[in-house]
């Protein structure tokens, strides 16, 4: 969607400001819930702000040996922005009206693609580890 919209913008005769957005919003918490639900894990969130943590509530996936009640996520102060606006929603109406752009990719589809790809990567990492090889982490 994003690349398609950029291409459409480049086809216009005059430069203008454009908002590339779906007009929908989701919380980080709901995004995390979607990701874990994709692999059959339900989370329970406790606390607020910097003290918020996620715990394993249930799991229907036998591949993962997850302990019910185990803390698996917590807010990282490095990324927490207490003064952040509560709700951010981009307005794509100009792009829809002037260019006929309508997003085709849903958040659910993105989560599905992302989680499927990450699971394949983690299987590869596990295979290497079990074979006695070290795998480097090039990410934060």
State what each model feature region is.
Residues 1-140:
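C-terminal substrate-binding subdomain of Rossmann-fold SDR/epimerase-dehydratase oxidoreductases
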């Amino acid at each position: 969607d994003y690349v398609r919209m950029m291409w459409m913008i480049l086809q216009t005769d005059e430069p203008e400001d454009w908002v590339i957005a779906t007009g929908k919003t989701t919380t980080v918490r709901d995004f995390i819930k979607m990701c874990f639900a994709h692999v059959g894990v339900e989370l329970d969130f406790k606390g607020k702000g910097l003290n918020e943590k996620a715990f394993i509530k249930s799991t229907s996936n036998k591949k993962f040996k997850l302990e019910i009640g185990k803390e698996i996520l917590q807010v990282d102060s490095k990324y927490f922005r207490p003064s952040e606006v509560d709700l951010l929603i981009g307005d794509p109406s100009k792009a829809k009206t002037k260019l006929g752009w309508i997003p085709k990719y849903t958040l659910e589809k993105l989560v599905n693609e992302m989680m499927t790809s990450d699971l394949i990567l983690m299987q590869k990492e596990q295979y290497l580890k079990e074979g006695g090889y070290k795998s480097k982490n090039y990410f934060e």
